[in-house]
């Protein structure tokens, strides 16, 4: 396992120790209160198994929640000390979750996924006020993953690729479609969590990426395709850049969850400031390329003793029975003894 100060998780911890002040944000787009979820559940709804040989023995992370065949499902990324793999859980009520098993395992014979494969999104209904029903593409479900080349915690520059399934349990892994070395300086250090949105025949692949160096920065950009083969990075990337000195997202503007609300594109993302606070923020735009950051925190870290006292980050959002549900990775404690699992906040009281 790598020294924490050179891992993403370790970098967050190092920033937390720094304890610097941060400044305010910019102007808030109108009517963003409809995206707020101030009522935290306050407990983990999914956590590590703690079984030594299990794929999710140490942590669960990066929720992606959707609806299919009358039930809710969540993909999640697990870590077992070697690398990331992808699990699936199911629920009837968005609170009580049953693990269904590992659906994407590392493949020792693959140069891409021999140590890691983290699927973060499956093409779903884009609408904000929806349960996130899955949509088939060419008769199958279409997911998107990222994978790091080495064993350990996010070791080496990750790539992004597509994957296909007929039943959600068995996946065909395609070669990477985005590589860090093909991009600009803001993404040369490696690619992170992807989000794939189909809109009027065009596929928009949102992702965050990092610069090179031990104290890198993370920002969010987008690449688009009409055929799922040729991808063109937006020339104005990063579309969600780091904020100015002292802002909430001075270090990281990461892990996009992008939905459509009428004529609006709504970007949920997580931030890291120089004080080491990781929390979920919001940006809103009229197209996939020009989000304006909102001057408010959607999900903040909790008080000492809470499940998210260290970090509250990595959003996944669905709508159910008149309420917006905002799932996120909740972290308490300090690396390497932190507790990392999935929690949820919603727009009305529990």
Stretch-by-stretch model annotation:
Residues 1-2, 307:
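Helix-centric, low-specificity signal for extended rod-like, repetitive segments
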Residues 27-119, 123-189, 197-251, 259-310, ...:
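Beta-rich carbohydrate-recognition and catalytic domains
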Residues 2-17:
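N-terminal secretory signal peptides and thylakoid transit peptides that target proteins
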């Amino acid at each position: 396992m790598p020294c924490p100060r050179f891992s993403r998780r370790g970098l967050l911890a190092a920033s937390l120790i720094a304890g610097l002040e941060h400044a305010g944000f910019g102007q808030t787009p109108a009517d963003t209160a409809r995206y707020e979820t101030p009522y935290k559940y306050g407990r983990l709804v999914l956590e590590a198994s703690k079984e030594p040989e299990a794929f999710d023995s140490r942590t669960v992370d990066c929720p992606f929640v959707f609806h299919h065949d009358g039930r809710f499902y969540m993909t999640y990324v697990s870590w077992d000390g070697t690398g990331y793999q992808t699990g699936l859980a199911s629920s009837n009520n968005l609170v009580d979750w049953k693990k269904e098993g590992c659906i994407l395992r590392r493949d020792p014979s693959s140069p891409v996924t021999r140590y890691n494969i983290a699927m973060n999104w499956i093409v779903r209904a884009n609408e904000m006020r929806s349960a996130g029903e899955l949509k088939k593409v060419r008769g199958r479900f279409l997911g998107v993953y990222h994978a790091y080349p080495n064993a350990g915690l996010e070791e080496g520059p990750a790539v992004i690729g597509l994957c296909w399934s007929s039943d959600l349990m068995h996946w065909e892994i395609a070669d990477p479609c985005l590589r860090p070395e093909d991009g600009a300086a803001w993404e040369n250090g490696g690619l992170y969590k992807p989000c794939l949105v189909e809109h009027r025949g065009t596929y928009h692949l949102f992702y965050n990426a990092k610069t090179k160096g031990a104290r890198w920065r993370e920002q969010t950009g987008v690449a688009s395709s009409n055929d799922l083969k040729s991808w063109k990075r937006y020339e104005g990337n990063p579309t969600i850049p780091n904020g100015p000195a002292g802002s909430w997202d001075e270090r990281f503007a990461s892990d996009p969850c992008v939905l459509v609300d009428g004529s609006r594109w709504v970007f949920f993302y997580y931030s890291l400031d120089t004080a080491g606070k990781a929390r979920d923020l919001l940006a809103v735009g009229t197209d996939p390329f020009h989000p304006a950051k909102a001057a408010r925190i959607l999900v903040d870290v909790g008080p000492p003793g809470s499940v998210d006292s260290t970090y509250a980050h990595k959003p996944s959002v669905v709508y159910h029975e008149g309420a917006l549900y905002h799932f996120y990775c909740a972290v308490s404690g300090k690396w390497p003894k932190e507790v990392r699992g999935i929690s949820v906040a919603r727009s009305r009281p529990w």
